[in-house]
Amino acid sequence: MLKLLRNNGINKLKSNLIRNYSTKQSIFQALDTFPKRHIGPNENEINEMLKSINTSKLSKKNPNSLEQLIEYTIPKDIRLNRELNIEENKVIGENQLLKDLKKIAEKNKVYRSFIGMGYYGTITPHVIQRNILENPGWYTPYTPYQAEISQGRLESLLNFQTMVSEFTGLPMSNASLLDEATAAAEAMQMCVNISKSKGPFAFLVDKYCHPQTIDTIKTRAEPKGIRIEVVDSKDFKFTEDVVGCIVQYPSSNGVITDYKEMADRAHQANALVVAATDLLSLALLKPPGEWGADIALGNSQRFGVPLGFGGPHAAFFSTKDKYARLLPGRIIGVSKDKQGNSAFRMALQTREQHIRREKATSNICTSQALLANMSAMYAVYHGQQGIKDIANAVHRKAIILAEGIKRLGYTVLDRPFFDTVLIITGDKTDMMIKELESRQINVRQYCSKSISISLDETVTSADISALLNGFSAHASKPLGLSSPEQLEKETSTISVISEEFARQTPFLTHPIFNRYHSEHELLRYIHKLQKKDLGLTTAMIPLGSCTMKLNATTEMYPVSWPEFNSIHPFVPANQSLGYKEMFESISNMLCEVTGFDGCSLQPNAGSQGEYAGLMVIRSYLTSIGQSQRNVCLIPVSAHGTNPASAAMVGMKVVVVDCDTNGNIDVADLKAKAEKHKDTLAALMITYPSTHGVFEEGANDICDIIHANGGQVYMDGANMNAQVGLCRPGDIGADVCHLNLHKTFCIPHGGGGPGMGPICVKSHLAPFLPGHSVVKGVGGERAMSAVSAGPWGSSSILPITYVYLKLMGGQGLKKATQVAILNANYMASRLKDHYKILYTGSHGLVAHEFIIDLRMFKESAGIEAEDVAKRLQDMNFHGPTMSWPVPNTLMIEPTESESKYELDRLCDALILIREEIREIETGKADRKNNVLVNSPHTEKVIVADNWNYPYSRSKAAFPTPATVASKFWPTVGRIDNVHGDKNLVCSCPPLSDYQ
C-alpha cells in the first residue's frame, strides 16, 4: 500500500511538473532572456514597492499595478496605446543574439587599410584592452564631478594632458574632445573669442587639411557668419578680418611643411595659428608650439585605440597658458584637499555651459575619457623611447615602400614625409586601386592622378611585399628586389626628415612615463587607479538627468570584435555591409521608439545632437524661404547645453519662465511665441521636464510653436521615462536627440564616449547631415557634416543594437515602467524626511525627483555639497547637485537598480537627515560635524590624532553596508578655489602620487 501511494504521488508530481511547465513555455524557448537581468527588482519586489506607493488610493482600476502607476504619472493624451514594434519583436536569448550579430559582423570585410586621413592601424596592448577598455571598473563611472571618489581616472586624464602638452610644445591641454574635426571647429571659434572683435570674421583653411575637417569647419562657420577661405597655406592673406588659420602637420597628402614664416605673418596681423597634427609624428618632428602654433589639435587614436569604423576616439587640444579660460572641453587640474594633500579635480568649471549657458566657451559637456585614458596608458607603457622606436619604425617602413615603388617606375612625390607616401599613378589610378582591393588592400585615391599610402605600427614585411606586388602588376619596370628586408638595408642611410624639421626637445619626461614599462607594473598601476574610483561596480550612481543604468556584459562584448573595431571609416561600401545592416536596423528601431521618420547616427554626443538638430531646423527653414527665423525659446530650467547649442547655430535665445510647480509657464510661452512669430525658429524642451515631472499640455505647447511658424526640438536627456510609454513624435516634436550613453546603455566611460543621434519628422529628413568623403550619408539635401566620422562613433553602436534587440518592445516598456516605479518608491520613502520639490498632479514623479535641502542652510549650516560628500562615506556617489534648482539633489535610480540598493540609498539619506537634526538640536556642532568634514579618508581615520567631536566609526562606518564592505574616498574634500587660483594642469612631482 505504501509503495502504491508513493508511486501515485510520484506520478502525480510528474504530471503536475509537466502540466505546469507546458503552460509556461516551450522547452526550446531561450532561458537566457535579458529583461529579467537588466531590470533590477524582481516581481515580488515590484509588487512590494507598488504597495508602498499605494496608487490604489487614486483608483480601484488595476490596483497597485505598473499600469496604474503609469496611468497617474503620464498624461493620457500622450500615452502610447500599443506595443513598440522592435523589428521581429521576438524573445531571444543573449547567447543566440551574439551569434546572430556575429553573422552580421562577418559581412564586414577586414582588409588591410592604408588610407590614413587621421585614422591608422594600431596595436592595443592587451593589458590595456582587457583592463581598461573591457573593464567595468573603468567604463561604468560617471564624469568626475565628485572628485574625491574619482582620483584614479583624474590622474590618468592628467597624464593624457601632460602627454599632449609635451608632444605639441604647448603648455595647456584639455582632457580630450570628441574627434579631430569638431576639435578644429572649436579651435576656429576659440580664435574668434580670443580676437574680442565684433566682426566680421574670417578663418583661413589650408587646402591640404583632411577633407572631413574642412567640411566640419564649414558647418560650424556658416551660421556664425564666419568667412572660410580654403587655399594653399603659402597663399594665406591675413586681411584685417582674419582671426586665425589652420594647417595640417604633416599635411593630408603626407608632406611635412615649414610653417614658421606663415606663422610669423599671422602673428604680425594679430591672427592665431592652429595646427591639426599627428601625435606619433611629433616623436620625430618639431612640435607645433616651437614653430609658432597657438593651438594644436588632432586625434590620439593611433595611441592604442582601435579604428572602430570612425570612433570613438579621443581628440586632443592644447594651447598657450594665457588662453586657458577660453579652452573648450574639460580641464583636469591639481589642487589640495582639506588635509593639505595634493588632489586632482576638474578645473575652471565656470567656463562650462551649465553655468554660462549661451555664453559658454563651447556647448560640449562631455569628452572621450575612456579613450583618452587608453591613449595615456599607451604612452605610460611605451615611454619616450618606446614611442620613438614606433615612430622611427613607421617612418622607415614608409621610406622602404617609397623606394620600392620608385624602382617599379612610379613617380613618388619628392617632399619630406613621415608615414604617408604619395604616388603619381596618372591614368592607372583606378586600375591600381582595383588591383590592390583585389589583394584585400585599401589605399587612398588622393586625386584622379595619384594614390597615397599611410603606414602605421601594425605594418609587417608581408604588408610591404603585398603593396609592392600590387604595384608591380602594372609597373613600367620589373620588380628588382622583392624583399623588404633587402630594401631596408639599402635605404638605411636615406633620411627624408631634414634637421630643420627634426625634433630636438625631449618628451614624456615625467617619471610617470618612465616607470611602468613592464606588464606587471602597468597592470598594478591600472588597478591602483581603478580602486580610487566609484563606478557601477561598487554602487548605484543616482545622478539625476544622467541615467546611470546597467551596461551589460553581453552588450559590451561585440565592441572588441575585429569585424567592428578594425575597419577604417573610409573603406569602400562593399566592405562594410555588416555595419550598413546594423545602422539601418538601429535607425529603424530608434524611429519606432521616438515616433519619427528619419535618423542620423553621426552626432558624437548629446551636445552634438542638439547642434545637429538645430542645424537641420535651420536648413529646413532656409529651404522654405524663412531664413530670417532665428529666435529659439528655451525654458529657464533647461540644461545649459540647450542655450549654448542655440548660440552655436546663430540663434538668439529667449528665455521662457517656469511656474511655481516647475512647469513651463504656458502663458509666458504663448506671449513670447506670438511676439516673435515672424522670427521664431524653435522651442527647445526637455520631456519629462528637468524637474522630473510629466507636464500636462505638452501637445498644446507644441501647437503654440507650430502656430507661430517654429519647430519643436525635444532634448532626449529624459528619454528613459518615455520609451514604450509615449513618443516625442506623437507629442508634437519635430526633432529629438537621443543620448545612447544614457537611455540605450552605452557606458559613460568616466566622462565619455557619448553618442547623440537625432531622429526627425519627414519634412526635416532631407537635411540630415552628410559627409564629404563617404557619399550617400544623410538626406537628399544633406547639410554638411557635424562629425569627423560618417556615422559618429560607430564601433559602440553594437551596444545599443544588442540592448534594443534583447529587450524587445515589451521589455523596453517594462524597463521604463520600473524606472518610474523606482523613482516613486524612493520618493515615497524619503518624503517624510525631505521635501520632494516637484510632483505631478497626482503626487507622483517621473523617473527622477528633486529633494529640497535649502532650508538646512539656515537651520544647520548644511548645503547640498555636504550631503553629497557625506554619501561618499556611505559607499555612494552623490546625486546631481544644485541643478536645476540650487541647493537641491536630483535623484535618478534607473530601472537596473534592485530594491536592496534603492533601500540602501534611502537608508543613507534618512540617516543623514538624522545627522542634520543633531546639528539643528545642538547635539552636534554647527561648524565641526560629520557632514561638513566629509568625506573621511582612510588616512584620516587611522591617524594617531583624532580631533573630531564624533567617533571614528560614525565617520567611516555609519551603515551596516560600510561595515561589511568599505569604499574609501582617496582624498578629503577638495579646495576648488585654490585649484582655480593656482592652475596646474600637468603631472605634479612624483611625491604627490605616493
UniProtKB/Swiss-Prot annotation:
Residues 1-21 form a transit peptide. One of its GO terms (biological process) is glycine decarboxylation via glycine cleavage system. InterPro entries: EF_Hand_1_Ca_BS (IPR018247), GcvP (IPR003437), GDC-P_C (IPR049316), GDC-P_N (IPR049315), GDC_P (IPR020581), PyrdxlP-dep_Trfase (IPR015424), PyrdxlP-dep_Trfase_major (IPR015421), PyrdxlP-dep_Trfase_small (IPR015422). It comes from the Eukaryota. The modification N6-(pyridoxal phosphate)lysine is found at K742. Its cofactor is pyridoxal 5'-phosphate. One of its GO terms (molecular function) is glycine binding. Pfam families: GcvP2_C, GDC-P. It is an enzyme of class 1 (oxidoreductase). GO terms for cellular component: glycine cleavage complex; mitochondrion. The keyword Repeat does not apply. It is found in: Mitochondrion. Its main location: mitochondrion. Its EC number is 1.4.4.2. Keywords: Mitochondrion, Oxidoreductase, Pyridoxal phosphate, Transit peptide. It catalyses: N(6)-[(R)-lipoyl]-L-lysyl-[glycine-cleavage complex H protein] + glycine + H(+) = N(6)-[(R)-S(8)-aminomethyldihydrolipoyl]-L-lysyl-[glycine-cleavage complex H protein] + CO2. The keyword rRNA-binding does not apply. SUPFAM superfamilies: PLP-dependent transferases. Signal peptide: none annotated. Belongs to the GcvP family. Homodimer. The glycine cleavage system is composed of four proteins: P, T, L and H. The glycine cleavage system catalyzes the degradation of glycine. The P protein binds the alpha-amino group of glycine through its pyridoxal phosphate cofactor; CO(2) is released and the remaining methylamine moiety is then transferred to the lipoamide cofactor of the H protein. This is Glycine dehydrogenase (decarboxylating), mitochondrial. It comes from Dictyostelium discoideum (Social amoeba).
